[in-house]
Amino acid sequence: MTSATNGGSLWGARFAGAPADALAALSKSTHFDWRLARYDLAGSRAHARVLQRAGLLTDVELDGMLTALDGLDADVTSGAFVAAESDEDVHGALERGLIERAGPELGGKLRAGRSRNDQIAAFGRMFLRDHARLVARGVLATIDALLAQATAHHGVAMPGRTHLQHAQPVLLSHHLMAHAWALLRDVQRLQDWDRRAAVSPYGSGALAGSSLGLDPNAVADELGFDSAVWNSIDGTASRDVFAEFSWIAAMIGVDLSRISEEIILWATKEFSFVTLDDAFSTGSSIMPQKKNPDVAELARGKAGRLIGDLTGLLATLKGLPLAYNRDLQEDKEPVFDAADTLELLLPAVSGMIATLDFNTERMEELAPLGFALATDVADWLVRQGVPFRDAHELSGAAVKQAESRGVELWDLSDAEYAAISPQLTPELRTVLSTEGSLASRSAQGGTAPSAVLAQRAAFEAQLAPVRDFAR
C-alpha cells in the first residue's frame, strides 16, 4: 500500500508516486520534534524579515506574513493547531498552518533561502540553550542544598574513606563541599558550552549557503545567537554541540549518582549516618518497617540512562560523511531525553539533600576509629625529623600492635610506644585526637576548619558568575 498523497511534506514534485506507508511512518517525526514549534515560528519571523530586507517580500507582504505567523503561534500555544497525520515533521506542519492562514501565494514565499537542514540545526541549538539554563538552575539548587548542610554542620567530623575503608578524619562540611565542587564544574561546563552553541547555522541552506542576498547574522541576532556560522557545511552537518550537551548531562548524572550512592550507604543501619525525610523516601508493599532511598536509587539508575543517551548519539554520528544525512533525525531524542531526565531528577535530588538529618554523634564517634590517625602519627614523626619512609614503618608497627590487642592507637601506653621506637615519645599524644588531626591539615584544600572556611569563600567567588548564566 502507498499513501494517497504526499501532503504535509516539503518535497515530492520530482517523484511519480507517493512514498510507501512504511516509509512515511518511518520518516514521521512530529511525535518528538513538535516541541520545537515555537523555535520554528521564531525562526520564520526572523526569516520573513530578512526576505523583506533582501527585496523578496514587500512591506505589505511582510505584515501579512507576520500576522499569519502570530496567529499560528497563538493556535499552537493553545492547542488549536496540532500536527496532522499527514505532516512529516514540525517544519512541514507549520508551513501548512501558515498557508492555511496566509494563503498559498504569500505563505509559499517563506521557504525561499532556507532548508530543513539549517532550520533543525539552529532550532535544536535554541532548544538546548534554553534547557541548559533550566538544568543549570537545578544543579545550582542541588549545590545550594549541599552548601546549606555544610554550613549547618561545619565543625562535625566524620570518617574520611578511600577504598570505602576508614582513612583519615575529615569534616562533614569538607566532604559535602567535594560534591559541590564537582557540580559547580558541571554548571561551568554548561556555561562554556553555551559559547559554542551560540553560533547560528540558520542561513546555511541545505549545505552551500544562500544565493538570495539574505543576511544570516540578522537572523542570528534576532534568535539570540552571538553570530552566524562561517561554514555552511559545518553548520548543517555538525552535531558536536548536541553531543557535548549530552556529555555534560551524562557527567551531571554521574556526579548525582556518586552523591546518591553515598546517601544509600549512609542511610543503612550499619552506617546510620543519615535519616531520610519521609517526603523523599518510600515504603515497602510487604515489609512495614522499610524506608527506602528511592530518590537516590533512581538518580543512580538515571545516570545509566543519561550515559546511554550520549553513547547512542555518538554512535549515530560516527560514520556520517558531510554534509547532512537523514541519520541526523536521530539526534534530537537523545538530547531531549537528557534534558527531560535532568529537569525531572534534579528537584528530587536537591530536596532529598536539603532534608537529610545527619547523625552527627555517630559520625564523630567513628571519625578516628579504624586506626584513622595512623597518618597523623607518621606526619608527627616527620615533624620531629624522621624520614617519612621510617615514619611510615613506625606508624604501621604501632597499628599492628594496637590491632593485636584489639584497641585503638590512643589506647597504647607510653611504654608500648617506646618499645616500638624511642622516637615515639609521649608528646605523640598531641596528635592522637580527631581535633588535632583536623586542625593540622590547614593548607589550602585541607580539611581543617579554617581551611574549609577559606574554601567556602573561594567557592562562592566562582559560584556568582554561573548564577548569572542560569538566570
UniProtKB/Swiss-Prot annotation:
Keywords carried by this UniProt record = Amino-acid biosynthesis, Arginine biosynthesis, Cytoplasm, Lyase
| Annotated EC | 4.3.2.1
Q: List the disulfide bonds.
A: none
Q: Which SUPFAM superfamilies match?
A: L-aspartase-like
GO-annotated molecular function: argininosuccinate lyase activity
A Gene Ontology biological process annotation? L-arginine biosynthetic process
Q: What is this protein called?
A: Argininosuccinate lyase
Q: What organism, scientifically named, is this protein from?
A: Renibacterium salmoninarum (strain ATCC 33209 / DSM 20767 / JCM 11484 / NBRC 15589 / NCIMB 2235)
Primary gene name: argH
